[in-house]
C-alpha cells in the first residue's frame, strides 16, 4: 500500500512541477493515527497526507495533475499483473505481484470517487470523458482482475 500511495503522490508532484507549479507533500497526522487504529480491525487504508499544489493553475491543469495519481496506480497495477502472469504458482513473486495488482487497482478506483478532495472530483470537473476512461480502466482492473490471484 505504501509504495502505491507514495508513487501516486509523486505522480501528482511531477505533473504539477511540469506545469511550473510548486508541489509539496503535507502529512495529515490524524489520518495516519486513524489508519493505524483501523488496521487493528483488519481494515488497511492509509491516506496520511497529500501533495499540495500552488501556483497559477486552471481547471484543465488541475484535472491533468489530479489524473496523474490514478494513472500511476493503473500503470503499476498493469506491471504487477504482468509479473503475476510471468511467475507460475506456487511462487512468492506471483503472490507479491498479485497483491501489488490488487492494491494499485483499488487505489486507482478509490481515488476516482467524484467527491471533494478526491482526484475524481477534480477530473470530473475538468473533463467527464477523461474521468470516464480512467474510472472504466480502474473498474475493469478491480472487478475483472480476479485471474491475477
Give the ranges of each region predicted by the language model.
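Hydrophobic transmembrane alpha-helices and their immediate loop junctions
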Residues: 1-149
Amino acid at each position: 500500500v505504501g509504495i502505491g500511495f507514495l508513487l501516486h503522490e509523486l505522480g501528482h508532484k511531477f505533473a504539477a512541477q511540469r506545469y511550473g507549479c510548486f508541489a509539496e507533500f503535507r502529512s495529515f497526522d490524524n489520518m495516519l493515527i486513524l489508519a493505524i487504529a483501523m488496521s487493528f480491525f483488519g481494515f488497511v487504508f492509509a491516506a496520511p497526507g497529500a501533495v499540495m499544489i500552488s501556483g497559477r493553475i486552471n481547471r484543465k491543469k488541475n484535472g491533468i495533475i489530479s489524473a496523474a495519481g490514478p494513472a500511476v496506480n493503473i500503470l503499476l497495477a498493469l506491471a504487477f499483473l504482468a509479473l503475476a502472469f510471468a511467475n507460475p504458482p506456487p511462487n512468492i513473486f506471483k503472490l507479491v505481484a498479485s497483491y501489488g495488482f490488487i492494491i494499485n487497482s483499488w487505489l486507482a478506483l478509490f481515488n476516482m470517487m467524484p467527491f471533494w478532495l478526491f482526484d475524481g472530483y477534480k477530473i470530473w470537473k475538468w473533463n467527464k470523458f477523461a474521468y470516464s476512461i480512467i474510472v472504466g480502466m480502474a473498474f475493469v482492473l478491480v472487478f475483472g482482475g480476479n485471474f491475477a490471484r
